[in-house]
Amino acid sequence: MGPRGSLLLGLIAAGLHCVAAVDQVVNAQLLEETMMAPTRLDRLNLYPEDKDTVFDFYAQPGMTWEPGSVVNANRATFPYAAGNGMTMALLNLGPCSMLPPHYHPRATNYVVAINGSTDTYMIEENGARTVKVTLDAGKMTIFPAASIHTMENKGCENVQLVSALNSEDTGTVNIANALFNWLPPTLVAPAVGYGPADLNGTAQTVPLVGTGSIFGRKDCLARCAKAGYKVHGSE
């Protein structure tokens, strides 16, 4: 590998670092060759079988409904997507599940509901109102780049949405994880009005990034369990 190739791999690795908790580079060599292909024809020839141009969301290791998942098709998970400037994501929310408050530093996010009913909340900046909308099947909303947003399934059935983002390296930052797990506690405590003991207790209960989704409100989980639905987060 020449200097140019080494540099390109370094840039790829740096660009994907922020989403490494969710997206792993499935084939670094193929990704490098795709991004360096001199022509579109050369690029296409890297994918000799027609099936090589297809991404199967349901075959991905992070695909789950318990509590749910965010499955991304981007240059990390699907090298064929490199160079198109987009990420497509399948959002799965199991009963009473949610995507915790988060933001994408490098992408605007278009989200459309496939089925069910999903409540969404979005805050663009200090001083802006909280925008709350309910997405029923066929309805879409937009989360501008770097806006804080969250989505919640308050029903007892699985809900699915599709997300299109205008970057193949969107980045995702979960607000609670950033505050309570990743920043120095001595900086966070004054900002949230906590004492050291309170802060440590909160940090221990923040869910891991995991598959991108977490179990939501306890009252919803209890309601669905009482109605006879199998809801694992209610234990």
What function would you assign to each model-found segment?
Residues 117-119, 148, 158:
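Structural motif
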Residues 157-175:
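A short hydrophobic beta-strand segment most commonly corresponding to one strand
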Residues 1-11:
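Classical eukaryotic N-terminal signal peptides for Sec-dependent ER targeting/secretion
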Residues 95-96, 134-156, 165-166:
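Conserved metal-binding segment of the jelly-roll/cupin
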Residues 11-89, 100, 202-235:
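A short, N-terminal "cap"/entry segment at the start of jelly-roll beta-barrel domains
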Residues 81-85, 125-146:
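Short acidic-glycine-tyrosine-enriched beta hairpin
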